[in-house]
Amino acid sequence: MSPAHALTGRPRFTYRTRLSSPAPRRLDGIDLARALAIVGMFYMHTWGHLWGDNVLRSAFEGRSSILFAVLAGVSVVLLTKSRDALTSVLQLVGRGVILVAIGLAISLDSVGPIVILVTYGFLYICVAPFVFRLNLLSAALAAATSTVALPVASFYLRRVLPDPPQFGATPTLGLVAQGEWGLFWQFLFATGLFPLLAWIPVFLTGVAAGKFLFAHEQAARWLVALGAPLFFLGYGGSWLFLRLSDFEARYSAFHPDGAEATEFLLHNAFGVTPTDWLSWLFIYVPHSGSIAELVSSTGISLFIIGLCLIACRSSVLFNDLVYPLRDLGKMPLTAYVGHILAIGYLNAHGHNIAEPGFALANLLGPIVFAMIWFRLFRRGPVEQLMYWALKPLSAVPAALRR
């Protein structure tokens, strides 16, 4: 990025760069997609709770976090495509460790179990180092296979694990301080709100998408063409399954709490599916980690990413008009951490971020801040701190070769 572009914060790059380019170029469409994920998260934590069920809540619920995770997988390709293997592994693991540390630090009681950064961090630590060198076909096969296999594995694993003291929990610093490592790992891998077994397929889908973007000129259009049918396959397949199988009536007769429990479980999940019926894996419920949810939500994520890339590349006017959102998308970690800290502060002082004034400030404040910040600096505040923390790792391979 040139100094002028770094100061203006409005670089104009195409959606595709050569594999031989010396450093990753900014992809405006990726920034826009990140911004949409951020806005979706803001909505779900504010107006989504205030207004109850509505079209926007249905559109964003569960999908914003999955879009984030797909984009995290794309970032693996951006981070490693111009680095050697050892430097890439060190950077990925280092990034993961920092994300885990930040996630634990902001997982306060006043925030509640909504912090996903620990899961993201372990994706970078445990998964990314083993998949970043896969070719496109291998990455795509890994994503497709895990989308089916890991929800099934999670289902049967959770049947033999002891029930957690609460559902929808996340790994927190409190668990670490209390030495509750068993619960920490159980929440992280299998029974928490963001279990790795459910998020690995999403992350791998992003890795495959990132490799595709740098391998094919028309990749963005193919992402749109692939994402739409995947969305309808997962969501429509779930709808069809519910009607053809008469699931609601049969499950209501089975469950001790009858139709009331069935209705609740069909619209609410806390990271995992119930383990009484395998059929839950074929039903779309936000935040359930079912096969249907993974297929549908990764599909719509690919569609959004492809559409954002096409729109930003095809129209200079559109690209300029959405630059406030693109600026927000260039500091996703800063926006996320600031949002979580705001929730914790307001909750601790008897307020709710869903109150109209706070909700509006929570949405507009980060956008205005990003617009001002990128007139002066190249990276977001937290992103710059991470860059400084990881920079020494780049010198390790050269030192080892001496």
Task: Give residue spans per PLM region.
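Alpha-helical transmembrane segments and their immediate juxtamembrane cytosolic regions
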Residues: 2-402
